[in-house]
Amino acid sequence: MTIAVIDYGMGNLHSVAKALEHVTHENVVITDDSRSIRGASRLVLPGQGAIRDCMSELQRNDLQGLVQEILRAQGKPLLGICVGQQMLMEESEENGGVPCLGYLPGRVRHFGRDLHDIDGQRLKVPHMGWNRVTQRHAHPLWAGIDDGARFYFVHSYYVEAQEDGDVFGTTDYAGLTPHVATGRGPVFAVQFHPEKSAHDGLRLLENFVNWAP
Amino acid sequence: MALAKRIIPCLDVDAGRVVKGVNFVGIRDAGDPVEVAKRYNQQGADEITFLDITASVEDRGTTVEMVERIAGEVFIPLTVGGGIRTCDDIRTMLNAGADKVSINTAAVTHPEFVHEAAERFGSQCIVVAIDAKRVSAEGETPRWEIFTHGGRTPTGLDAVEWARKMVDLGAGELLLTSMDRDGTKAGFDIGVTRAIADAVSVPVIASGGVGDLDHLVAGVKEGGADAVLAASIFHFGEYTIPDAKRYMAEHGIEMRL
């Protein structure tokens, strides 16, 4: 049994792999090799940086078609993290508009500029730090994690899924309710960084490793 | 507002050991970075900043190794600063397990590097470190300038304007250190913290001068900081992270407890 962290040249691969190794004895590989990716029992799609670069690196490494094929086949669990969550949507408004993988209906939007809270305090973008995640629907990946637990975020764009059934978790920021945990079938994706969210983050990764959708 | 303010212990690391200078002289040894980072993680630190102050190029490899070891055991965000000058430096640190890099001198000498780095890696992992020093006299309208080389070299750049420029170029966060206060334990320079926090759209980390827990509260409530960074009050056991978090929460600040 192998968990493959898809390496397309972007993303915090070391952190994700180390955190997975911390919660499982299964083999964790960081790979861009299509045979290893096909052969893995589970996949992690990380993402860091600008989404235009993430999508173009995925294409340049001939991995976009493979990932789409795997998503269509619905055969193995896949966890998207950060920009990896965003890439599963239809398109992002970052970098002037970028088409994405289109696994879930909906788009990726910017928080906006010059935001203020009700006290007039300036709200910062990126949304950076530990925020509470409300669990909208039950999911095996929430096992053992309190509703409202804090996870670590750092992002300026957020997912807005079209269908409520695809939304498993939300947070509150800038008067918005970003869809920070989304999924369908064997796919689960989070905007926050479970690999950087201390105990609850490791628990989510452990749940992913044990998930049998 | 549910987003918590952050407490960030800072590890100043020289040739593989945590040190903390008092006004950058009189360095005391505070231990192995990996052990120190693990302790802070267990205590519930919200992030860790690793500042490489190693002077010699040969010892830089040690830093990468340290970052790898910390990232293998500590599952909270890790920022690495010190000597970040090229996109290759950034790539190396991110691959070693850093989540963000902090750019200091290179931002002053080559501001376009901040833009290049943000375009390549995303603003969210680009922190610009701003070392500011008050240049106005007592009674004058307060003014701060950017200093480099540990506060020794003036640049003539206005700190608030500089902060705005760095954000325009793509900085995702600012690490603001008062060079007047660093190492003094007299508290943050609230004036410059407030001025910059109000001037920019990105999070500001207040740094330099923390001597007690009231200083942390003031950094957030009066300074408007999104995060507070401290070293010596934690390194030498005066306060623990939970002490600090409880105290700040008691003062009405949203914290991750």
UniProtKB/Swiss-Prot annotation, chain B:
Pfam family, one: His_biosynth
Keyword Oxidoreductase on entry: no
Catalysed transformations (reactions): 5-[(5-phospho-1-deoxy-D-ribulos-1-ylimino)methylamino]-1-(5-phospho-beta-D-ribosyl)imidazole-4-carboxamide + L-glutamine = D-erythro-1-(imidazol-4-yl)glycerol 3-phosphate + 5-amino-1-(5-phospho-beta-D-ribosyl)imidazole-4-carboxamide + L-glutamate + H(+)
Gene Ontology CC: one annotated term: cytoplasm
Localization per Swiss-Prot or TrEMBL: Cytoplasm
E.C. no: 4.3.2.10
Keywords (A to Z) from UniProt: Amino-acid biosynthesis, Cytoplasm, Histidine biosynthesis, Lyase
Main location: cytoplasm
Active-site residues, as the UniProt record annotates them: 12, 131
Pathway note: Amino-acid biosynthesis; L-histidine biosynthesis; L-histidine from 5-phospho-alpha-D-ribose 1-diphosphate: step 5/9
GO MF term set: imidazoleglycerol-phosphate synthase activity; lyase activity
Membership in a protein family: Belongs to the HisA/HisF family.
PANTHER family, alphabetized: IMIDAZOLE GLYCEROL PHOSPHATE SYNTHASE HISHF, IMIDAZOLE GLYCEROL PHOSPHATE SYNTHASE SUBUNIT HISF/H IGP SYNTHASE SUBUNIT HISF/H
Complex and partners: Heterodimer of HisH and HisF.
This protein's name: Imidazole glycerol phosphate synthase subunit HisF
